[in-house]
């Protein structure tokens, strides 16, 4: 209604503008026209900034058939050894072996060992460092040390300090002492009673060859030495004497 009144007022109003034929007359603005129809859609705009990742979706259905097994991996480091298991039951008794005299391989081995042993004894005997009496062998390395050191040397070699238990053994040891021209300790030691001597294993002495008047150390000389003539004398154990071992 307001627009209609305004239009009538403009129509009834006298024209105040005059213009010549040569001039362009400019009138008052007209009534606004009706809106036009929509234009064509515009072009797509530029991509926007990348958004944050969305939440994980639900688990999908299982896939197809399982694939083939992969190749074996490298062998790992050895594990810690386990605890020792219980001892097993004894096995069945085996068949009896051949008698030694029928075992050709054993006989050949024994023959070879015997041959090498005889060779060694022969060589050392020529050097004057070994004497064999019965089942015993007496040997020296030519060194002179105290009694305890001799025991250790002989033990390391698998023997013990030489000690005669018969006249024949005494003569064998005496021959080494004479050749080396050095007294030697024997495998004897004085017991609790002065003048009573025993073998080192504790057994009483069953053979002696004391020098006249010996022993006379009265408990102060606990060891026994052999002279170059084979006679015995009690002596303190700290002197240096020839190493002679028996095997």
Curated annotation (Swiss-Prot):
User: Where in the sequence is the signal peptide annotated?
Assistant: 1-15
Q: Which residues carry this modification: 4-hydroxyproline?
A: 29, 32, 35, 41, 53, 56, 62, 66, 69
Limits of the C-type lectin domain: 132-247
Got any disulfides in this one, which pairs?
154-245, 223-237
Glycosylation: which residues?
A: 206
Regions of compositional bias (Pro residues) in chain numbering: 53-64
The GO terms this record gives for MF are: carbohydrate binding; metal ion binding
Indicate yes or no for the key word Secreted. Answer: yes
Recorded hits in PROSITE patterns, A to Z, give:
C_TYPE_LECTIN_1 (PS00615), C_TYPE_LECTIN_2 (PS50041)
Q: Which residues form the Collagen-like domain?
A: 27-99
Region Disordered: what ranges? 30-100
The protein's job, in short, is: In presence of calcium ions, it binds to surfactant phospholipids and contributes to lower the surface tension at the air-liquid interface in the alveoli of the mammalian lung and is essential for normal respiration. Enhances the expression of MYO18A/SP-R210 on alveolar macrophages.
Identify this protein by name: Pulmonary surfactant-associated protein A
Quote the gene name from the UniProt entry: SFTPA1
